[in-house]
Curated annotation (Swiss-Prot):
Pfam families: His_biosynth (PF00977)
Species for this entry: Helicobacter hepaticus (strain ATCC 51449 / 3B1)
Keywords: Amino-acid biosynthesis, Cytoplasm, Histidine biosynthesis, Lyase
Pathway: Amino-acid biosynthesis; L-histidine biosynthesis; L-histidine from 5-phospho-alpha-D-ribose 1-diphosphate: step 5/9
InterPro entries in UniProt: Aldolase_TIM, His_biosynth, HisF, IGPS_HisA/HisF, RibuloseP-bd_barrel
Subunit structure comment from the entry: Heterodimer of HisH and HisF.
Protein name: Imidazole glycerol phosphate synthase subunit HisF
Gene: hisF
Length: 251
Protein backbone atom coordinates (compact mmCIF):
# COMPACT_ATOMS: atom_id res chain seq x y z
CA UNK A 1 0.00 0.00 0.00
CA UNK A 2 1.28 3.49 -0.76
CA UNK A 3 2.00 5.85 2.11
CA UNK A 4 -1.06 7.42 3.69
CA UNK A 5 -1.80 10.97 2.57
CA UNK A 6 -1.85 13.42 5.47
CA UNK A 7 -4.44 16.04 6.43
CA UNK A 8 -2.87 18.98 8.27
CA UNK A 9 -4.82 21.86 9.85
CA UNK A 10 -2.85 25.09 10.23
CA UNK A 11 -3.25 27.47 13.16
CA UNK A 12 -2.12 31.08 12.66
CA UNK A 13 -1.09 32.38 16.08
CA UNK A 14 -0.95 36.05 17.06
CA UNK A 15 -0.16 36.97 20.66
CA UNK A 16 -1.02 33.49 21.86
CA UNK A 17 -4.43 33.30 20.12
CA UNK A 18 -5.53 31.61 16.90
CA UNK A 19 -6.49 34.18 14.28
CA UNK A 20 -7.79 33.98 10.74
CA UNK A 21 -7.91 36.66 8.08
CA UNK A 22 -7.94 36.74 4.31
CA UNK A 23 -4.40 37.44 3.09
CA UNK A 24 -3.35 38.55 6.58
CA UNK A 25 -5.87 41.41 6.57
CA UNK A 26 -8.78 41.81 8.97
CA UNK A 27 -7.59 39.24 11.50
CA UNK A 28 -10.39 37.70 13.54
CA UNK A 29 -9.93 35.84 16.80
CA UNK A 30 -10.72 32.17 16.14
CA UNK A 31 -9.98 30.82 19.61
CA UNK A 32 -7.53 29.25 22.05
CA UNK A 33 -4.73 27.30 20.32
CA UNK A 34 -4.66 24.51 22.91
CA UNK A 35 -8.42 23.88 22.64
CA UNK A 36 -8.34 23.98 18.83
CA UNK A 37 -5.28 21.72 18.60
CA UNK A 38 -6.93 19.25 20.98
CA UNK A 39 -10.07 19.26 18.83
CA UNK A 40 -8.04 18.49 15.69
CA UNK A 41 -6.16 15.76 17.51
CA UNK A 42 -9.49 14.17 18.50
CA UNK A 43 -11.00 14.60 15.01
CA UNK A 44 -8.27 12.59 13.32
CA UNK A 45 -5.86 15.18 11.91
CA UNK A 46 -2.51 13.60 11.03
CA UNK A 47 -0.42 16.60 12.06
CA UNK A 48 -0.84 20.24 13.03
CA UNK A 49 1.13 23.29 11.89
CA UNK A 50 1.39 26.35 14.15
CA UNK A 51 2.40 29.57 12.45
CA UNK A 52 3.46 32.50 14.65
CA UNK A 53 2.40 35.32 12.34
CA UNK A 54 3.58 38.15 14.60
CA UNK A 55 6.84 36.40 15.46
CA UNK A 56 8.35 39.46 17.10
CA UNK A 57 10.83 38.99 19.91
CA UNK A 58 8.41 40.04 22.65
CA UNK A 59 5.94 37.41 21.45
CA UNK A 60 8.52 34.61 21.36
CA UNK A 61 8.04 33.77 25.05
CA UNK A 62 4.27 33.50 24.55
CA UNK A 63 4.80 31.04 21.68
CA UNK A 64 7.05 28.83 23.83
CA UNK A 65 4.25 28.63 26.42
CA UNK A 66 1.67 27.78 23.72
CA UNK A 67 3.93 24.98 22.42
CA UNK A 68 4.44 23.56 25.93
CA UNK A 69 0.69 23.53 26.56
CA UNK A 70 -0.13 21.93 23.21
CA UNK A 71 2.56 19.27 23.70
CA UNK A 72 0.78 18.17 26.91
CA UNK A 73 -2.56 17.78 25.13
CA UNK A 74 -1.77 16.61 21.60
CA UNK A 75 -0.39 13.23 20.56
CA UNK A 76 0.04 13.77 16.83
CA UNK A 77 3.17 15.47 15.43
CA UNK A 78 3.10 19.25 15.24
CA UNK A 79 5.43 21.78 13.71
CA UNK A 80 6.05 25.43 14.48
CA UNK A 81 7.05 28.19 12.09
CA UNK A 82 7.22 31.96 11.89
CA UNK A 83 10.15 34.22 12.71
CA UNK A 84 12.58 31.38 13.43
CA UNK A 85 16.03 32.78 12.70
CA UNK A 86 18.59 30.71 14.58
CA UNK A 87 19.50 27.27 15.93
CA UNK A 88 18.76 28.69 19.40
CA UNK A 89 15.17 29.54 18.37
CA UNK A 90 14.76 25.99 17.03
CA UNK A 91 16.25 24.37 20.10
CA UNK A 92 13.92 26.30 22.43
CA UNK A 93 10.82 25.24 20.46
CA UNK A 94 11.87 21.59 20.11
CA UNK A 95 12.65 21.49 23.84
CA UNK A 96 9.19 22.95 24.52
CA UNK A 97 7.70 19.90 22.79
CA UNK A 98 7.13 20.45 19.07
CA UNK A 99 8.24 17.75 16.60
CA UNK A 100 9.31 19.82 13.60
CA UNK A 101 10.49 23.32 12.81
CA UNK A 102 9.39 25.25 9.75
CA UNK A 103 11.72 27.90 8.31
CA UNK A 104 10.92 30.26 5.48
CA UNK A 105 12.45 33.74 4.98
CA UNK A 106 15.44 32.95 7.20
CA UNK A 107 16.37 30.00 4.97
CA UNK A 108 16.35 32.21 1.85
CA UNK A 109 18.49 34.87 3.56
CA UNK A 110 20.88 32.29 5.01
CA UNK A 111 20.60 28.93 3.19
CA UNK A 112 23.37 27.57 5.44
CA UNK A 113 20.75 27.52 8.22
CA UNK A 114 19.16 24.48 6.52
CA UNK A 115 22.47 22.57 6.55
CA UNK A 116 23.21 23.51 10.16
CA UNK A 117 19.74 22.71 11.49
CA UNK A 118 19.49 19.39 9.61
CA UNK A 119 22.90 18.42 10.96
CA UNK A 120 22.04 19.33 14.54
CA UNK A 121 18.41 18.17 14.79
CA UNK A 122 18.04 15.74 11.85
CA UNK A 123 16.36 16.32 8.48
CA UNK A 124 13.12 14.78 9.77
CA UNK A 125 12.71 17.89 11.99
CA UNK A 126 13.30 20.48 9.28
CA UNK A 127 10.44 21.72 7.10
CA UNK A 128 11.29 24.43 4.58
CA UNK A 129 8.22 26.57 3.87
CA UNK A 130 8.12 28.02 0.37
CA UNK A 131 5.57 30.71 -0.60
CA UNK A 132 5.25 31.22 -4.34
CA UNK A 133 3.49 33.35 -6.96
CA UNK A 134 3.08 32.33 -10.58
CA UNK A 135 5.17 34.46 -12.95
CA UNK A 136 4.47 32.65 -16.23
CA UNK A 137 2.81 29.50 -17.56
CA UNK A 138 5.11 27.00 -15.83
CA UNK A 139 7.19 29.20 -13.59
CA UNK A 140 6.79 30.40 -10.00
CA UNK A 141 8.92 32.78 -7.92
CA UNK A 142 9.58 32.44 -4.20
CA UNK A 143 8.31 35.26 -1.98
CA UNK A 144 9.47 36.10 1.55
CA UNK A 145 8.38 38.33 4.45
CA UNK A 146 4.88 36.87 4.65
CA UNK A 147 4.51 36.79 0.87
CA UNK A 148 5.25 40.49 0.42
CA UNK A 149 8.75 40.48 -1.15
CA UNK A 150 9.86 38.68 -4.33
CA UNK A 151 13.13 36.92 -3.52
CA UNK A 152 13.91 36.58 -7.23
CA UNK A 153 14.45 32.85 -6.75
CA UNK A 154 12.77 30.28 -8.98
CA UNK A 155 10.56 27.79 -7.10
CA UNK A 156 12.08 24.59 -8.49
CA UNK A 157 15.68 25.78 -8.14
CA UNK A 158 15.11 26.83 -4.54
CA UNK A 159 13.28 23.62 -3.55
CA UNK A 160 16.05 21.51 -5.09
CA UNK A 161 18.67 23.52 -3.21
CA UNK A 162 16.75 23.28 0.08
CA UNK A 163 16.47 19.49 -0.29
CA UNK A 164 20.16 19.16 -1.17
CA UNK A 165 20.97 21.10 2.00
CA UNK A 166 18.91 18.76 4.18
CA UNK A 167 15.25 19.82 4.22
CA UNK A 168 13.14 16.81 5.22
CA UNK A 169 9.88 18.22 3.89
CA UNK A 170 8.62 21.16 1.82
CA UNK A 171 5.52 23.16 2.80
CA UNK A 172 4.51 24.74 -0.50
CA UNK A 173 1.98 27.59 -0.46
CA UNK A 174 0.48 29.28 -3.50
CA UNK A 175 -0.03 32.94 -2.60
CA UNK A 176 -2.29 33.23 -5.68
CA UNK A 177 -4.81 30.68 -4.38
CA UNK A 178 -4.37 31.29 -0.63
CA UNK A 179 -7.65 32.18 1.07
CA UNK A 180 -9.67 31.92 -2.17
CA UNK A 181 -11.26 28.51 -1.45
CA UNK A 182 -11.11 27.88 -5.19
CA UNK A 183 -8.81 24.86 -4.98
CA UNK A 184 -5.08 24.26 -4.64
CA UNK A 185 -2.69 25.29 -7.45
CA UNK A 186 -2.51 21.87 -9.08
CA UNK A 187 -0.03 22.95 -11.77
CA UNK A 188 2.34 24.06 -8.99
CA UNK A 189 2.10 20.65 -7.30
CA UNK A 190 2.51 18.87 -10.62
CA UNK A 191 5.70 20.90 -11.23
CA UNK A 192 7.37 19.56 -8.05
CA UNK A 193 6.33 15.92 -8.49
CA UNK A 194 9.89 14.73 -9.03
CA UNK A 195 11.17 16.20 -5.73
CA UNK A 196 12.21 13.32 -3.49
CA UNK A 197 11.00 14.69 -0.14
CA UNK A 198 7.34 14.92 0.94
CA UNK A 199 5.44 17.97 -0.36
CA UNK A 200 2.72 19.57 1.76
CA UNK A 201 0.32 21.54 -0.47
CA UNK A 202 -1.14 24.74 0.95
CA UNK A 203 -3.39 27.55 -0.22
CA UNK A 204 -6.89 27.35 -1.66
CA UNK A 205 -8.76 24.46 -0.03
CA UNK A 206 -12.50 25.04 -0.18
CA UNK A 207 -14.10 21.63 -0.71
CA UNK A 208 -13.45 17.94 -0.17
CA UNK A 209 -12.89 17.59 -3.92
CA UNK A 210 -9.99 20.04 -3.66
CA UNK A 211 -8.19 17.64 -1.30
CA UNK A 212 -8.78 14.65 -3.58
CA UNK A 213 -7.54 16.66 -6.58
CA UNK A 214 -4.31 17.80 -4.97
CA UNK A 215 -3.47 14.25 -3.87
CA UNK A 216 -4.09 12.95 -7.39
CA UNK A 217 -1.65 15.60 -8.66
CA UNK A 218 1.09 14.33 -6.37
CA UNK A 219 0.93 16.09 -2.99
CA UNK A 220 1.90 13.95 0.02
CA UNK A 221 -0.08 16.07 2.48
CA UNK A 222 -2.65 18.87 2.28
CA UNK A 223 -2.79 21.81 4.66
CA UNK A 224 -5.80 24.06 5.26
CA UNK A 225 -6.99 26.51 7.89
CA UNK A 226 -10.36 28.25 7.70
CA UNK A 227 -12.34 25.31 6.25
CA UNK A 228 -11.40 23.36 9.39
CA UNK A 229 -11.62 26.22 11.92
CA UNK A 230 -15.15 27.11 10.92
CA UNK A 231 -16.17 23.45 10.52
CA UNK A 232 -17.04 23.86 6.85
CA UNK A 233 -15.22 20.54 6.44
CA UNK A 234 -14.99 17.94 9.23
CA UNK A 235 -11.75 15.96 9.14
CA UNK A 236 -13.43 12.59 9.83
CA UNK A 237 -15.89 13.11 6.97
CA UNK A 238 -13.08 14.31 4.70
CA UNK A 239 -11.06 11.16 5.35
CA UNK A 240 -14.06 8.91 4.68
CA UNK A 241 -14.66 10.82 1.43
CA UNK A 242 -10.99 10.43 0.40
CA UNK A 243 -11.00 6.73 1.26
CA UNK A 244 -14.08 6.24 -0.93
CA UNK A 245 -12.20 7.98 -3.74
CA UNK A 246 -9.32 5.52 -3.39
CA UNK A 247 -6.94 7.94 -1.66
CA UNK A 248 -4.91 6.14 1.05
CA UNK A 249 -5.57 7.86 4.39
CA UNK A 250 -5.19 6.94 8.04
CA UNK A 251 -8.70 6.54 9.49
Amino acid sequence: MSLAKRIIPCLDINGGRVVKGVNFIGLQDAGDPVEIARRYNDEGADEIVLLDITASYEQRGIMIEVVKNIAKEVFIPFSVGGGIRSLEDMSALLNAGCDKISINSAAIRNPQLIDESAKRFGSQCIVVAVDVKKVSQNSWNVYINGGRVDSGKDMLEWINEACARGAGEILLTSIDTDGTKGGYDKAMIEAVKSINVPIIASGGAGSMEDFADVFVHGADAALAASVFHYKEIEIKMLKTYLQDKGVPVRI
